[in-house]
A protein has these predicted regions:
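N-terminal pre-catalytic "stem/leader" segment of glycosyltransferase-like enzymes
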Residues: 1-96
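Extended catalytic core of nucleotide-activated donor transferases of GT-like folds
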Residues: 9, 64-140
C-alpha cells in the first residue's frame, strides 16, 4: 500500500475512533405535522449527539419546516441540519448515511457514495414499496 493510501486509511481510523465521522440521518419534511417515525429519527440523532458522535439531519428541500412546532426547539438547535437541494455533501468513507425504508428510491442515487449506507426499517410494510421494479436491497 502506498504512503498516501496508508495515510488516508490511518486518518479514517482516527476519525472513527474520535467519533468525528458524520452520521447523516435522512428525515422527511412533515410540514409541521407530528409523526412518530420522524421523532424516532430525531431521538436517535439526539442520543448519538449526547454520546459524543456527529449526527446531521438531512432533508430534501431548503424550505424544510422542521419539528420545532411539535417537538420544541431543542431538536432543531441541538442537532445540525443540512439540505441536499442544490448542495454538494461532503461524504467520506468513514461517514454513515441512514435512510428510512420509505426512501428506498434514494438508494439508487446514493449507491456510489463512498460511505456506509444503513436502511432504518421502521415499518416492514414499506420495505419493498419504494424500490424500483426489479431492484432488491442486496443491490445496494
Amino acid at each position: 500500500m502506498g504512503n498516501l493510501a496508508q495515510e488516508k486509511v490511518l486518518q479514517s481510523i482516527k476519525t472513527l475512533r474520535e467519533k468525528k465521522a458524520r452520521i447523516y440521518l435522512f428525515a422527511q419534511d412533515t410540514k409541521g405535522n407530528a409523526k412518530a417515525s420522524v421523532k424516532y429519527i430525531y431521538d436517535v440523532a439526539s442520543t448519538l449527539k449526547k454520546g459524543g458522535f456527529n449526527p446531521i439531519i438531512l432533508h430534501e428541500k431548503n424550505d424544510y419546516a422542521g419539528v420545532e412546532s411539535w417537538l420544541g426547539n431543542e431538536y432543531m438547535n441541538e442537532i445540525p441540519h443540512q439540505s441536499i437541494e442544490g448542495q454538494n455533501l461532503e461524504i467520506s468513507p468513514e461517514d454513515f448515511l441512514i435512510l428510512p425504508e420509505i426512501f428506498g428510491y434514494v438508494m439508487d442515487q446514493v449507491k456510489t457514495l463512498p460511505c456506509a449506507k444503513i436502511v432504518l426499517t421502521q415499518s416492514y410494510a414499506y420495505l419493498l414499496e419504494t424500490l424500483q421494479p426489479g431492484q432488491t436491497w442486496a443491490q445496494f
